[in-house]
């Protein structure tokens, strides 16, 4: 913030400030737990590894832990992540259904210029061969 002549604002962590708040705020005080809390990941990938160290490392190796930027952060950190915030990450949903502006009409040529040239050459010259 020194760029804007703002000083003495303390340590700023822009990534942490943009992160989603996963805990719900309550006014009641909870009693102190007597045991350690269970190890459950905050990003929702618990069902993949189920607290198994070997399953977790296998999931990391096979890239099974699906965490998209819009699941972790409230707003995109970079311009490259901006597109993933629009994208639906449901496995059964196609992007064309959620964002109709992606779809473009296709005008295919059944007979291209090269195909027409070949057909014309074959009809006019019996000895014509491409090779």
Curated annotation (Swiss-Prot):
Q: Which GO terms describe its biological process?
A: flagellated sperm motility
* Record keywords, A-Z: Cell projection, Cilium, Cytoplasm, Cytoskeleton, Flagellum
> What InterPro entries does UniProt report for this protein, alphabetically?
SPMIP11
Chain positions covered by the region annotation Disordered: 18-44
**Where does the UniProt annotation locate this protein?**
Cytoplasm, Cytoskeleton, Flagellum axoneme
Which N-terminal stretch is annotated as signal sequence? none
| Basic and acidic residues bias spans | 21-33
Q: Which superkingdom?
A: Eukaryota
Which Pfam families would you find in this protein's record?
SPMIP11
**Listed GO cellular component terms?**
axonemal A tubule inner sheath; sperm flagellum
> What is the recorded function of this protein according to its Swiss-Prot or TrEMBL entry?
Microtubule inner protein (MIP) part of the dynein-decorated doublet microtubules (DMTs) in flagellum axoneme. May serve to reinforce and thus stabilize the microtubule structure in the sperm flagella.
Subunit structure of this entry?
Microtubule inner protein component of sperm flagellar doublet microtubules.
Specify the protein name.
Sperm microtubule inner protein 11
Q: Which organism is it from?
A: Homo sapiens
């Amino acid at each position: 913030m020194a760029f804007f002549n703002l000083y003495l604002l303390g340590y700023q962590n822009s990534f942490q400030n943009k992160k989603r708040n996963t805990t719900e705020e309550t006014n009641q005080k909870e009693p102190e737990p007597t045991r350690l809390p269970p190890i459950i990941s905050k990003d929702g990938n618990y069902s993949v590894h189920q607290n198994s160290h070997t399953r977790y490392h296998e999931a990391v190796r096979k890239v099974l832990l699906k965490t998209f930027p819009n699941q972790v952060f409230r707003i995109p950190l970079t311009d490259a992540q901006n597109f993933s915030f629009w994208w639906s990450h449901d496995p059964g949903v196609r992007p064309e259904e959620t964002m109709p502006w992606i779809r473009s009409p296709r005008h295919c040529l059944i007979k291209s210029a090269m195909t027409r040239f070949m057909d014309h050459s074959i009809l006019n010259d019996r000895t014509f061969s491409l090779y």
